[in-house]
Amino acid sequence: MRKKLKAVLFDMDGVLFNSMPYHSEAWHQVMKTHGLDLSREEAYMHEGRTGASTINIVFQRELGKEATQEEIESIYHEKSILFNSYPEAERMPGAWELLQKVKSEGLTPMVVTGSGQLSLL
């Protein structure tokens, strides 16, 4: 027996909104202020990871150690503040139309994110 589809899940970053340029810039700038190197291009490679994971990868490479919980919280907080200072991300092409189509078919569109950034939740 086929089950009736009730909802469609959409990721936010890179699916509904083009926010990655802002995420990569914020990561790059915050790491730079801490004397750490994370290029904008490399930040894209870490998309989908938790902030703690990204920070620890950079700490391991640059400092040969894991970041403390305090360092993780501080750096991620700084990154979030900087990200939130940027203009609102543009919708991805076709995202609005697709959401409207989903709704017109009687389905519930739902947004999901792996982000722990409170401003996005």
Model regions: which residues?
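Active-site neighborhood of HAD-like aspartate-dependent phosphohydrolases
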Residues: 2-42
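Conserved acidic
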Residues: 19, 42-43, 71, 87
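Residue-level detector of short coil/turn "hinge" positions at structural boundaries
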Residues: 38, 66-67, 109
